[in-house]
Amino acid sequence: KTKLTLDEMAPLGRGTNDPQILMVNCKKTKYKTPEEFVAGVKAGDKLTYGGTQSGTIDHITVYLWAKMMGQPMPNYVPFGGGAELATQLVAGAVDVGTLNLSEALSQVEAGDVCPMVILDRNPMAPIPKAKTSIEMGIDLELATVRGYATHAGVDLSLIHISEPTRPLI
């Protein structure tokens, strides 16, 4: 972790948005489709969710997801990072993992983890069976935003920024 504060940093640009994806253990879940998963959540199925740390985008995602489903905040288990969360989802420590695709792609490809709902409007080619929240009529889009920053006070004229990325600053 950095000891820098926001006041000590200057943004350079956004790198990417990684949509939040709700994933389940393929072998241990009763949900075989995104529709079954959403129906179960709306019906009040008691599920334990996992994410990275407390107070992060994962934690906020679980809260907002439950709220959109008309449910109270479920049990949330914080893990040290996405890799640990994906491993613990496979092990059965949680019922649902709030992950980005890059954090669990190997487990998805192995058939251990099944992505259910992409909290975005755009489908993702590597996970064609997952549905977007928008496709399912759920107005909830959340992503991990990744970007670049430098120390505040750096003369930005010394940093080459290509024209296509300049509007992102």
Report residues per predicted region:
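Beta->alpha turn/N-cap motifs
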Residues: 1, 81-82, 99-104, 119-121, ...
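Short, charged, surface-exposed secondary-structure boundary motifs
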Residues: 125-129
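Short helices/loops that flank or line small-molecule/ion binding pockets
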Residues: 39-41, 64, 68, 83-97, ...
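Short, well-ordered beta-strand segments
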Residues: 48-50, 97, 116
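Extracytoplasmic "Venus flytrap"/periplasmic binding protein-like
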Residues: 1-4, 106-118
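Conserved helix-loop-beta element of the AMP-binding
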Residues: 10, 37, 112-124
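Hinge/capping helix and adjacent helix->loop/strand transition within the periplasmic-binding protein
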Residues: 2-84, 133, 138, 143-162, ...
